[in-house]
Amino acid sequence: MAKIIWTIGRFGLLLIPLIVIISRLQVEWYWFDQFELGSVYGKRLLLQLGGALFAFLFVGSCALWRQSWLRPSESEKNERSPVLTGYRYGFCLLACLLVLLSVLAIDTRLAWLAWIEPFSLSYWWSLPFSTGWPLLSLSILMLTLIMFGLTRSRRLGLTQVYGSVCICLIVARSWGLWSLAFSIPNLGRVEPMLGSDVSFGLGRFSAIAFGLELVLLQLSLTLSTALWSRLTRSTCLSDWAFPGLTARQRHGLRPGFALVLMSFSGLMWLSRHQLLWTQDGIVAGAGWLDVHLLLPLRSLGSIALLVLAFVVLPSPFSSVRRRQLRLILAFIAIASFGLEMVLFPLMHWLVVRPRELQLERPYISRAIEATRHAYQLDAIETEPFDPSSRLSREDLRDGASTLRNIRLWDSQPLLATNRQLQQLRVYYRFTNAAVDRYQLRPELLERQQVILAARELDQAALPKRSRTWQNRHFVFTHGFGFTMSPVNSRGADGLPDYFISDIGSSERINGNKALDISRADVKKNVPIGRPALYFGMLPSPYAVAPTQIEEFDHPEGDVNTYNHYSGRAGIPLASFGQRIAASIYIRDPRLLNTGVLKPDSRLLLRRDVKKRVKALAPFLQLKGDPYLVSVPMESGLDQYHDDQHQYWIVDGFTSSNTYPYASTLPDGKEMRYLRNSVKAIVDAYNGTVHLYVSEPDDPMIRGWQKVFPELFQPLESMPTSLRQHLMVPSSMFELQVQQLLRYHVTDPRIFYSGDDVWQVPKELYGKTQIPVAPYHITAQLKRSLDSEFLLLQPLTPLARPNLSGWLAARSDADHYGELVLLRFPSDVPIFGPEQIQALINQNPEISQQFGLWDRAGSQVVQGNLLVVPLGNALLYVEPIYLRARRGGLPTLTRVVVSDGSRVAMANDLNTGLEALLQGSGSKDVVVQELDQSS
């Protein structure tokens, strides 16, 4: 009976992990299948299974060799190599143990990374060592296994098994690395030093290098455990001497050592490519000394190691000559490494430094060209712009469309107002406000700039007594609605105007008489429909809907309104098996006995839109914040529903730190290549995800399209109503600006001298000086062009406040993604934001007014200073907000404007512009001439 119970118990222990694995696979399959992408998940499983099988064959071969090598042979008992005694024996023990410990420590770390962050494995050596408890536990287990097997070969085999399991896990979880290496196409750009296509660095180099590292780790583990088993036999430890290896054992070690040398040779050969993305010289990539010293030395060392590997193998030639050849080859390999360490700094000081520009000039040109291409700076269209010194009425007429969209509301004051007036309940949150444009005036070409903020539900803000399991997962399941405000209008009380505000029966849709926008136009072009936000930016737990419990929908005054989810998202919970699998997946057995599930109940997982996209495409980087749009959806589209209007737009990026000759970012981030390759659209109600390729020429995304063709769609197939709201992501634009500060220069001599370096100017926001962030404007890049939606960044020379240029990113229609650099004349000083703000604050009347408000208990907040092109002039606009010191609402009180020759402060923009033109003020208008020599 006891034996039967023991057998059943062992079978149960094996069955439990099997059930967990099957449950997780089932839930994941259902999750992908809701997007009709079950094939993507199946392909990923097959890739991992294939990788694990390949790794298993390799580690299995190593284990069989080890077992064969350790098998005793009676006929060779007396054939021994020289004896190791004393310190030599101790040194061999120590070396073997250090190799064993090092390999298993690296295996443990890589296995942990493979489990939690598999797409970081290609640059694992640059990541900080994690000391979290899971890794610590694994390390303790590893050390225990080693100590347990120190003196027993049989037990030491457990460490071999542990390391082999780690390798299989690592190879399986690295499916993305291997897939991209096999699928990435050539870009057609060849780097000049080694003649390889740049796609080798983008996709293949990391896979080959990582594969060789894994081979080296497994071979080192196998050899060290085998040798340790021989070195630590009981007679050896008691005598502190090792009688030596038999001839068969010595010959058996040769193939293993040869493979180790081949792996080192391959890594050293690949290290030649690493010269292409070093950052040690004056620019990125290989310089003169790298090409003329390091490249030959590394090539020589690699070839020497490869030949040495073949010489180590058993051979019929004379052992004396082969021993001499081995010594010569080993000396060459070691000498090449030593010479690199010694000669490089010496030759740099003696040879390169005295004539650095002459020697490095062609390599500087390569670095400039590569960096500009890696960040798409080579596609910038440069336009000279010589603004007039004074604003004219003709400029106002030419720039009328720009004036109609001058932004007076910053995101932060608007969010502060929303949080006090529009959150309505403690658990609602406005986490972000996005500047966008909508066609609210059909008679005009340009679209109205607005700020749209989603009203999400924050589970963490629920009162403590309401944070029950049922409330968190069945009742409080979604946010509701959004607010929309014009950027250029305010109410009589100085608070923002709203096109859309409040919720439920109190929901208001308003036009704006001052902007000549009717309520009907707002209602038509910004439909609301079902504004429930089941998927959003805030982290949210899983939800179960619909159930017999009604979900909180929105408040109606003091009464709450309830509803049932009728969307298409989620994992079915109709059968008992599906519920068991779901409860195991979410690790919550309460789902089984809740008693409120219905046949159509579904489990909503990954409700954070970025996590949702990341789960489908883990190879994408998701930078920046998603933004919500509400658009009329045309009927007849297979993948969209005309009764659903709220969608999140998420920007997906492909990047690499191994693009030849490209520079890293100025802040030290290891990124040398970046593309905004994907635009993801996430339905805020139904949770559907669509991935559109926005950079079809990017070799990395083309490689992923080969692997998962069903996952991507061309950008042209995106509904027009959504395409009209695409924007150049500010997160990428900021990185391009960082690189442009130095790499706007294309002349190697000027680049080397550092005479023409730019910087991002600073401005005063509130009481704090901050860098001017990129801002959206609707403006004309040229008088001959229509106004368009731009992302703009002013630029000034290093250590000087005058404007040197603007970088503008275009987001409209056929010009999406184009970069335009407006260059100002260098011989005429153009005031920068910092100078204009200083002149504003130095104005006696303006500073006196600020002081009066301050003494009256209000805090003056100087908003973002905008510099916009207007006709043939520049217009500087700064909104002034007042806020009570103790959490009051920010109100738009004044607008300061300047054209560089005068500064005026008035109640509104139009009054300020008129004062600038006339050059005279009034009771509520301050005007002052500026000193042009400042």
Swiss-Prot record:
Which compartments does it reside in? Cell membrane
Q: What is its main location?
A: membrane
Q: Which InterPro entries match?
A: UPF0182
Membrane topology value: Multi-pass membrane protein
The residue ranges crossing the membrane are 2-22, 45-65, 86-106, 129-149, 165-185, 208-228, 251-271, 300-320, 327-347
| GO cellular component terms given for this protein | extracellular region; plasma membrane
Key words, A-Z: Cell membrane, Membrane, Transmembrane, Transmembrane helix
> Which family does the UniProt entry place this protein in?
Belongs to the UPF0182 family.
Cross-referenced HAMAP family, in alphabetical order?
Answer: UPF0182
PANTHER family in alphabetical order: UPF0182 PROTEIN SLL1060 (PTHR39344:SF1)
Its name, as the record gives it, is UPF0182 protein sync_1321
Source species taxonomy: Bacteria, Bacillati, Cyanobacteriota, Cyanophyceae, Synechococcales
